[in-house]
Amino acid sequence: MVLAAIFFGGTPILATAMAYPLAICAACVITSIIGTFFVKLGTNNSIMGALYKGLIVTGALSILGLGAATSFTIGWGSIGTVGGIEVRGGNLFVCGLIGLVVTALIVVITEYYTGTNKRPVNSIAQASVTGHGTNVIQGLAVSLESTALPAIVIVGGIIATYQLAGLFGTAIAVTAMLGLAGMIVALDAFGPVTDNAGGIAEMSHLSP
């Protein structure tokens, strides 16, 4: 909203440009609420799978909500220029999509580097066999490696959105990312709970 006031101040589009981020957030909040109803256990009884199902549904519905917010606020045509770059409603919609894609990629990367059946965690476990020193070294190496892909994804998203609609496009992408915060926080909160519960059940030799 602040950037909208800076870039479009004194123009007829000011009010709608300031309302656009609010419309995106409102749409994503509604889609997050709807997504919670899809968090149900499947035939494999995977709790994390149920949470990811809700996240996928929320993301898919957020695309529709983003399109609706764009259509009913600023439209799909040109709304002005930002830093010499023409800003169009369609470009802002694409910026929002990029924000959602960046969020999805970060979730996938996080799952890869923290999953117990993936190479990074298994390599740390294997290094533990030879002692504490190799465990610490391998853990540090994996932790440093794990920051590379998210950084590349975020930088790529920033460059793409800036080329499409300047700083305002980057702000819209960030707004779309924050629109999924409800489901992301739910994953962060319940993920460790399910992992710990699974570990306790395994050490107790309980049936699946």
Curated annotation (Swiss-Prot):
Localization in the cell: Cell inner membrane
Keywords for this protein: Cell inner membrane, Cell membrane, Hydrogen ion transport, Ion transport, Magnesium, Membrane, Translocase, Transmembrane, Transmembrane helix, Transport
One GO CC annotation: plasma membrane
Cofactor(s) needed: Mg(2+)
Transmembrane region(s): 19-39, 54-74, 89-109, 140-160, 167-187
Membrane topology note: Multi-pass membrane protein
Any Pfam family hit: H_PPase
Catalytic activity: diphosphate + H2O + H(+)(in) = 2 phosphate + 2 H(+)(out)
Domain of life: Bacteria
GO MF, any single term: inorganic diphosphate phosphatase activity
Enzyme Commission number: 7.1.3.1
Family per record: Belongs to the H(+)-translocating pyrophosphatase (TC 3.A.10) family.
Function as written in the Swiss-Prot or TrEMBL entry: Proton pump that utilizes the energy of pyrophosphate hydrolysis as the driving force for proton movement across the membrane. Generates a proton motive force.
Oligomeric and partner information: Homodimer.
Stated name of the protein: Pyrophosphate-energized proton pump 2
Natural source organism: Mycoplana dimorpha
Record lineage: Bacteria, Pseudomonadati, Pseudomonadota, Alphaproteobacteria, Hyphomicrobiales
